[in-house]
Curated annotation (Swiss-Prot):
It comes from Pseudomonas putida (strain W619). Transmembrane segments: none annotated. One of its GO terms (biological process) is translation. The gene is rplA. GO terms for cellular component: cytosolic large ribosomal subunit. This is Large ribosomal subunit protein uL1.
Amino acid sequence: MAKLTKRQKAIASKVEAGKVYNFEDAAALLAELSTVKFSESFDVAVNLGVDPRKSDQVVRSATVLPHGTGKTVRVAVFTQGPAAEAALAAGADRVGMDDLAAEMKGGDLNYDVVIASPDAMRVVGQLGQVLGPRGLMPNPKVGTVTPDVATAVKNAKAGQVRYRTDKNGIIHTSVGKVGFEAGKLKENVEALIADLKRIKPASSKGIYVKRVTLSTTMGPGLVIDQSSLNA
């Protein structure tokens, strides 16, 4: 049997198996256990009462977190004319049409979000095999295909997170960084859960938000007592 590392021993000694944690206690413990040399993210996993095999129960959307994620977001926009000027003014890192598509086909994909105006989809449509596997393909369901590209850029830069239920009916997303004030981190999680409840599929029956788990990039996952959240 492999020996536990010092970090693993610390986690094993402080994390109670099967315990449900108050949000503030969970955030504080995870921050305490974060001893790596980089700034870890706080991530949340929400188990939803949906059947992801049914298309009408796939939950896919985007939420602008009130305090962002703490990450610098690079945004590329496919658009032209006045909309291109508006996108640049809103903070887009790169704006273009065929020229931008050529760059991406050539391997320049150093972007976190790709946005497109509807008239640009004739160009973006050629990039499915390039953008799709990376989760960058613009989609109207998450607000990345829109005539109002400037607002989409502002939302992305402000810390908008995008998510989709996986095959087990769970959504995963980052909600902040270790070092965030607990109150701000909590408000981010509450905003996410409120949005999830708002878009609950009509065909979903029974308990919708089954479990909320908070973790750090390299840390354990702690189950959160939902009564400690205002959502």
